[in-house]
Amino acid sequence: MGSLSPSDLSPAQIGEHLRVAGRVAAADGAQCDVVDALGGVRVRLRERTGLSAGDLVVIYGEYTGDDLRDAQVVSRTPCAEPRGDGDFARFAWRGVARNLAARARALAAVRSYFASERFLEVETPLRVPAPGVDLHLDAIPASGDYLITSPELHMKRLLVAGLPRIFQLARASRRDELGVLHEPEFTMLEWYRAFAGLEQVLGDTERLLRSVAESVSGAARLFSPSGQVYALDGPFERITVREAFMKYAGIADAVDLSQSDEARYFEVLVTHVEPGLAREARPIFLWKYPANQAALARLSETDDSVAERFELYVGGVELCNGFDELTCPSEQRARFEQDSARRAAENRPVYPIDERFLAALESGMPRAGGNALGFDRLLMLAIGARELGEVLSFPARER
């Protein structure tokens, strides 16, 4: 006869005699609480047994819906009582295990959504010789290679190879990133639609968020760390970068500012625009970025001073970064070389340009829309967590 965990018990088992295995959380004579990280059950023993908090036990008794009665100890392994700062306390008492259960439901919802859209789940290398040259991301060295900051370049090679719709839940790493919304290692959800553009990916993003939120909380809504509720019904509002800088900072042309004084552009973005977006009681797509702020996106066909790039903000949290993808190999090489030169001028690490990616573009990449979404951030908002570490098994501070 196998054993159940305390969190396995359900009303359907009332009246059955069951074996239940777990850890003793508290003991008082002939009564004790047996728990796992996700739940517990009160046990009423036939006789006093000398059980102590921390013991690992298997108990046999009749389940009443409230407790196990007339119970016997089948086996006992004496163990120390869990410390308040230990792993058991963090997972069982501070709710991290429940967050991991929500994470599992969210992952299933992601895979279900993309299966319904006929996407293929893929895996690409985590350690690469050329991690990209993004001006604002530093890669972590790994035995002569680098850990990926994003799976983007290899996924685009798959588009060139003829895969029409792909997604990946990738482990990504970035150097010197740690805070309420940042971890040096995190899960990136990235997807691409060949022969598609920004509109299709914007639609994916809206539908995916609803699906994940419903899987976690039963409703299409997200929660900021302060408790603000964000309904996900209806099309999300869109505001261009130019409009946002005017609305929240009184700056007439963000594109001109990004070209003439990039440092000031980022200062205004962080101190005025993002806080302004955080005050809005709804999800907002910020799009039409200055061309010099989107090295991997194609330029707008109606205004070549802006690129077809978007980010989604919910409660001031940037959730994703999407593009109508650049497919021109010569333009992509020029942008890579420009960014590499800037990294060198700023005394930042300079990484090799990915020649295999550029060679793939030479073969012909179809027009595509793509998005990179911080899965951990989405889960954080789905459960209303205060920081990213609450939705991870072992954040950097717990490793």
Predicted regions and their residues:
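Class II aminoacyl-tRNA synthetase catalytic cores and aaRS-like
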Residues: 1-399
